[in-house]
């Protein structure tokens, strides 16, 4: 699991952290809980994803 402790309130481009709790309409999958790797660079509500 990948845990990212910092947040990025702005929409994240490729290779950046995307916070689903601030951008609930972000498309693509993502990791909830402590965050996770998402091929689409998206994250669900309340989760965080790392865009590749």
Swiss-Prot record:
It comes from the Eukaryota. Residues 27-52 have a biased composition (Gly residues). Residues 16-25 have a biased composition (Basic and acidic residues). Residues 1-52 are annotated as: Disordered. This is Uncharacterized protein DDB_G0295473. It comes from Dictyostelium discoideum (Social amoeba).
């Amino acid at each position: 699991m990948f845990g990212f402790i910092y947040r990025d309130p702005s929409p994240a481009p490729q290779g950046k952290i995307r916070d689903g709790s601030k951008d609930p309409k972000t498309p693509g999958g993502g990791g909830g809980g402590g965050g996770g790797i998402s091929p689409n660079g998206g994250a669900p509500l309340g989760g965080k994803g790392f865009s590749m």
